[in-house]
Amino acid sequence: MEEQKSGRKTRVGRVLSNKMDKTVVVVVERLIHHPQYHKFIRRQNKFKAHDAQNACRVGDRVIIEESRPISKDKRWVVVQVLDKAVI
């Protein structure tokens, strides 16, 4: 079967915190090119994402997907855990 495209934004990031119940903080890093100095600069954003099974641990690489607002700050859902953190 073919998968349906959801049309929602997805991001790949690293779990920074899992101290809240069913919520993780995911940091997404990207490189931007500075127009004047022609250097690549690392920028990052933090997103709170819903983790229904509390499966994510700090350091895991995850895929998050945009969703309806779940709380005041939570608008993303953890779709898949790509890599488990090496402890």
Curated annotation (Swiss-Prot):
<dbReference type="GO" id="GO:0006412">
    <property type="term" value="P:translation"/>
</dbReference>
<comment type="function">
    <text>One of the primary rRNA binding proteins, it binds specifically to the 5'-end of 16S ribosomal RNA.</text>
</comment>
<keyword id="KW-0689">Ribosomal protein</keyword>
<dbReference type="InterPro" id="IPR012340">
    <property type="entry name" value="NA-bd_OB-fold"/>
</dbReference>
<dbReference type="InterPro" id="IPR000266">
    <property type="entry name" value="Ribosomal_uS17"/>
</dbReference>
<comment type="similarity">
    <text>Belongs to the universal ribosomal protein uS17 family.</text>
</comment>
<dbReference type="InterPro" id="IPR019979">
    <property type="entry name" value="Ribosomal_uS17_CS"/>
</dbReference>
<dbReference type="InterPro" id="IPR019984">
    <property type="entry name" value="Ribosomal_uS17_bact/chlr"/>
</dbReference>
<keyword id="KW-0687">Ribonucleoprotein</keyword>
<keyword id="KW-0694">RNA-binding</keyword>
<dbReference type="GO" id="GO:0019843">
    <property type="term" value="F:rRNA binding"/>
</dbReference>
<protein>
    <recommendedName>
        <fullName>Small ribosomal subunit protein uS17</fullName>
    </recommendedName>
</protein>
<comment type="subunit">
    <text>Part of the 30S ribosomal subunit.</text>
</comment>
<dbReference type="GO" id="GO:0022627">
    <property type="term" value="C:cytosolic small ribosomal subunit"/>
</dbReference>
<dbReference type="Pfam" id="PF00366">
    <property type="entry name" value="Ribosomal_S17"/>
</dbReference>
<dbReference type="GO" id="GO:0003735">
    <property type="term" value="F:structural constituent of ribosome"/>
</dbReference>
<keyword id="KW-0699">rRNA-binding</keyword>
